Amino acid sequence: MQEALLIPEIRPERFLDPSAGTGMFISTLKDVPEIHCFEKDRLTGRILSSLYPKSKVNIEGFQSIQPYYNGYFDVVSSNIPFGNTRIYDRDFDRSDDPVRKSSLAAVHNYFFLKGMDTLREGGILAYITTSGIMDSLQNRPVREWLVNHANLVSTIRLPDNLFTDAGTEVGSDLIVLQKNTRKSELTEKERNFIETRIISDSIHINNSYAGLDHIVHTSVSMGKNMYGQPAMNFTMKGVSEPLPNISGSYWHKMWGTILTGNFMKKTCPVPPFPLP
């Protein structure tokens, strides 16, 4: 993704990583004029500040971002945290929108809605996130909210063994959305994104992946997720070698699609985009 953002025609002016760690997502974005990062761990945040002194590093949780930054960023992108960690955000807690209020109960849901708030119209949100966002029945309201406030550009399911070097095997998705609060109808792709279906043994999978399309894998099996619940396990042999080629071509094709909508123009049209 970082390579795609270096293409001159699509280089963003304002980039936000709401869960930056030590800066994996911003490591190649030196030519982006304005980069903001959030990292709540104090030690990691200090390392991040030292590595990227020209970036605006906030050593605090994403929920502390100021209202000034609503509608501000061109791109919001990160490998976001997941789990049932409750977040406190006064504006969300007092909201009349039930999806906003309920998103506070799960950090990954909150990051999607809060990230969307910080984007300008036509801006891009690209998150690596737990597969529970797309597969969980409980998250249907969140998925519906997202595609009613943004165009679904694309999704891709990553292999469970992608992050074994970090000591974890977890199902994850790359979800890409383009903010569009003026849309009046959903595409078939977006309706599929909202719904799930049962495969077997109470295993739910998002309708976007019903034919196992857009899933990076060489093998699939019935097993369990990291919480011990029944799940489909997708793995890829030699994951460290082919994935950069796959993701590189995927991102270049996706950004090419966005370019046709003049994404970087401040008053861009926001058409529905086909899957890459």
Q: Residue ranges of each PLM-predicted region?
A:
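Conserved S-adenosyl-L-methionine
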Residues: 1-85, 129-132, 175
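Mobile active-site "lid"/loop adjacent to the S-adenosyl-L-methionine
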Residues: 80-111
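Charged, non-catalytic accessory extensions
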Residues: 274-276
